């Protein structure tokens, strides 16, 4: 839940939380950084919110993503303040704006500035390394529920591909803030050199490598199919950790320019800033 994650990183854990929408996505991280995580109640997700639970928790502020702003009147009718953050059109600016807006409401402006500075540094550091790169790999970022869905240009996955020194192979399809269903014929026509799948996908790398329908694709033939980290929280979503997604993308596409050691230094810096913790490459699922 990228919206709730903004409150987690600005509080350095569960400081501002009385309830969760969905605990599952980043459970491996939240269990370690949010005291009493298991006791925090889930109040529903998406448009299925249990208003009685929200009211009973004595909620002072509800934060919603733009795609669920139609729920605002329900909370206003219950006299609960609502803050709409996280634009549906995803980019690094979306993350900056989300952290800035919520930090103002929580009085965490200085903390937000430090996190945004780290995010900006990842792209800034990548640019000079990529100056002389003439060949940028074509990449397709697949969706989680189906391998026959792709990230279009309006999603933050495209920003990650480009910041890491690649080119999104997807063309001719678009949608705001969601993966687009496509046919295997379309993916074959794009013939990506690299395929990334989310860590939370319902299928595996081997599923693709062993599927004859995919066998003519460059990324499959050269076994350049990778799980986008991390095992404790997604780095490919519009959250503060997307800066680590930039660093991993750069390492994955151009390992000669950006080493695993450099990547892990940035990982340690980020998690120290946000949670005063560090994690090993093994814990993060980074090979």
Q: Model segments located where?
A:
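A short, structured surface patch at a secondary-structure boundary
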Residues: 1-57, 61-67, 169
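Short, structured coil segments at secondary-structure junctions
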Residues: 13, 36, 78-80, 164-165, ...
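Structural recognition of the beta-strand scaffold that forms the well-ordered cores
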Residues: 16-21, 61-65, 81-86, 137-143, ...
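Short helices/loops that flank or line small-molecule/ion binding pockets
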Residues: 49-58, 181-191
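A ligand-binding cleft/hinge motif common to bilobed small-molecule-binding domains
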Residues: 69-77, 198-210
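Extracytoplasmic substrate-binding proteins
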Residues: 71-149, 170-171, 227-287
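Alpha-helical scaffolding within the catalytic cores
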Residues: 121, 125-128, 179-186, 209-215
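Alpha-helical, coiled-coil/dimerization segments enriched in small aliphatic residues
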Residues: 150-178
């Amino acid at each position: 839940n990228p919206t709730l994650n903004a409150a987690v990183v600005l509080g350095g854990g569960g400081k501002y939380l009385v309830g969760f929408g969905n605990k599952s996505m980043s459970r491996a991280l939240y269990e370690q950084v949010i005291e009493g995580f298991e006791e925090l109640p889930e109040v529903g997700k998406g448009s299925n919110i249990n208003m009685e639970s929200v009211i009973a928790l004595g909620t002072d502020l509800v934060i919603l993503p733009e795609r669920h702003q139609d729920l605002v009147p329900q909370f206003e009718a219950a006299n609960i303040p609502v803050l709409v953050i996280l634009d549906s059109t995803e980019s690094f600016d979306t993350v900056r704006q989300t952290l800035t807006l919520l930090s103002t409401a929580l009085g965490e402006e200085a903390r937000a500035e430090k996190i945004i500075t780290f995010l900006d540094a990842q792209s800034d550091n990548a640019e000079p390394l990529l100056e002389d790169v003439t060949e940028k790999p074509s990449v397709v970022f697949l969706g989680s529920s189906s391998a026959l869905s792709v990230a279009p240009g309006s999603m933050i996955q495209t920003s990650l591909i480009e910041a890491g020194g690649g080119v999104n192979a997807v063309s001719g399809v678009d949608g705001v803030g969601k993966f687009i269903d496509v046919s295997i014929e379309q993916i074959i026509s794009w013939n990506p050199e690299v395929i990334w799948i989310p860590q939370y996908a319902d299928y595996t790398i081997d599923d693709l490598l062993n599927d004859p329908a995919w066998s003519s694709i460059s990324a499959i033939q050269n076994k350049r199919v990778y799980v986008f980290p991390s095992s404790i929280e997604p780095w490919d979503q519009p959250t503060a950790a997307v800066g680590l997604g930039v660093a991993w993308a750069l390492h994955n596409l151009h390992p000669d320019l950006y080493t695993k050691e450099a990547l892990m230094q940035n990982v340690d810096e980020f998690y120290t800033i946000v949670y005063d913790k560090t994690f090993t490459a093994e814990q993060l699922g980074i090979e």
